[in-house]
Amino acid sequence: MLRVAVPNKGSLSESAAEILSEAGYRRRTDSRDLTVLDPSNQVEFFFLRPKDIAIYVGSGELDLGITGRDLARDSGAPVAERLSLGFGRSTFRYAAPAGKDWKVEDLAGLRIATSYPNLVRDDLSARGIEASVIRLDGAVEISIQLGVADAIADVVGSGRTLRQHNLVAFGDTLCDSEGVLIERAGSPADDSARNQLVERVRGIVFAQQNLMLDYDCPKTILDDALKITPGLESPTLSPLADENWVAVRAMVPIKGHNGVMDELADLGAKAILASNIRSCRAL
């Protein structure tokens, strides 16, 4: 039976549960449940702290896990990404009090508070910068005000929390993070149970990022229309009652699809319809 780790709480939890449910797997009905058995799919889900998931998967005790890329890298566990999931996107950056034009080199000799000490140490080491890294489990923004640290390194979403504490982010991103599906590094590629879950989830992720576009197109503009909607492999063309027209169906990315519809309409296409995709096996 496949053993899969899922975040038990936090920003990744609900999105992970939703994507697995859409992929046909059983959801837990009580947030206090630590395990859920899905006998019809031969999977057992374990609900764990997001920061611990890479450790369990890297040890080989669990086959797959959903966690954040930043958490997986900071863990130091021997894991590999199988799939980017497209949710929980954030950046991991240095920040310090506003009012100075900070550069990463300015961190030399300072105290840096973070919940991701390994990520920070690795980055500082790569830059040849010596600084003191202070590990905190959360709310690192307040550490400067309390005199514990001179700067921080933390996940940055909208930046609102930094502004509330009069902090400014600087330097390159240490890690562009999002939810990822991980496995132990070096896992066999021919594990059918593991691969089935990966492909199901991949189909949901693809469906969330694409939609199906249908439209009627005069044959006189068909070549130009197909340049706008080339589809995944090739669009589907179907004859219409009027032999001068064809029906076209093609997948297009959700991002920017309204612009695609505008282009088709300006070109002369009619009855342009966008439909959501629930799931697919497209890749």
From Swiss-Prot:
Major localization class: cytoplasm
CDD domains: PBP2_HisGL1
Needed co-factor(s): Mg(2+)
Keywords for the protein's UniProt record, in alphabetical order: Amino-acid biosynthesis, ATP-binding, Cytoplasm, Glycosyltransferase, Histidine biosynthesis, Magnesium, Metal-binding, Nucleotide-binding, Transferase
Annotated catalysed reactions: 1-(5-phospho-beta-D-ribosyl)-ATP + diphosphate = 5-phospho-alpha-D-ribose 1-diphosphate + ATP
Gene3D superfamilies: 3.30.70.120, Periplasmic binding protein-like II
Name used for this protein in its record: ATP phosphoribosyltransferase
One Pfam family per UniProt: HisG
GO BP annotations listed: L-histidine biosynthetic process
Means of activity regulation: Feedback inhibited by histidine.
EC number, UniProt record: 2.4.2.17
Family annotation (PROSITE patterns): ATP_P_PHORIBOSYLTR
GO molecular function: ATP binding; ATP phosphoribosyltransferase activity; magnesium ion binding
Subcellular location: Cytoplasm
Enzyme class: transferase
HAMAP family: HisG_Long
UniProt gene name: hisG
One Gene Ontology cellular component: cytoplasm
Family indicated by similarity: Belongs to the ATP phosphoribosyltransferase family. Long subfamily.
Purpose of the protein: Catalyzes the condensation of ATP and 5-phosphoribose 1-diphosphate to form N'-(5'-phosphoribosyl)-ATP (PR-ATP). Has a crucial role in the pathway because the rate of histidine biosynthesis seems to be controlled primarily by regulation of HisG enzymatic activity.
Domain of life: Bacteria
Pathway: Amino-acid biosynthesis; L-histidine biosynthesis; L-histidine from 5-phospho-alpha-D-ribose 1-diphosphate: step 1/9
